[in-house]
Design a protein with these regions (language model features):
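Conserved alpha/beta-domain cores
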Residues: 1-169
Length: 169
């Protein structure tokens, strides 16, 4: 209801809904039904609905999720934790948390490929691109559409992105 008010009464029709931690396509359907019951329907008045791609099932079933959502945003922190089975806040396991781990980068590559194959945009939010310019360059080489960055890493990461884009032509 609040989102409907923001879009319709306050005039912020460019607000995009981002659905977090959506485990299954059936759960996505229930979320979209609940939104529709409250007057928010995908495509009406330009409403776009994105899904956080932060669970391995989101990547594996991306084709099915893409029929329900307008885009994805990779939640690299949660995806890394769930792919590697680690808790980045644990004193015992935090040293194993790394978005650049091969299992994680393969999962991210697959997510990007699957989203683009379905004709939808995919971005990334999380610490990875801000903390590791080489990770940002990897994302560019894979064709990511957008990245969120921490303000203190913006200039450094933009330089890495520009260099990677120059190399990819």
């Amino acid at each position: 209801r609040a989102l409907k008010r923001v879009r319709e009464e306050l005039g912020f029709s460019n607000v995009i809904v981002m659905v977090p931690f959506c485990r299954t396509p059936a759960e996505a359907d229930r979320v979209l039904e609940a939104m529709a019951e409250n007057g928010l329907r995908r495509g009406e008045n330009g409403l776009q609905i994105y899904m956080m791609c932060e669970i391995p099932s989101n990547v594996i079933l991306a084709e099915q999720f893409a029929t329900r959502f307008d885009g994805f945003s990779i939640g690299s922190n949660d995806l890394t934790q769930l792919v590697l089975g680690v808790d980045r806040d644990s004193g015992i396991l935090a040293n194993l948390f790394d978005e650049r781990d091969e299992a994680v980068t393969r999962m991210i590559s697959e997510a990007i490929r699957n989203a683009h194959a379905a004709g939808i945009k995919i971005g990334i939010c999380g610490q990875g691109p801000s903390n590791h310019p080489d990770f940002a360059a990897f994302l560019v080489s894979e064709g990511i559409d957008s990245m969120s960055l921490n303000p203190d890493s913006f200039v450094r990461t933009i330089k890495a992105v520009a260099e990677a884009e120059g190399q990819s032509g």
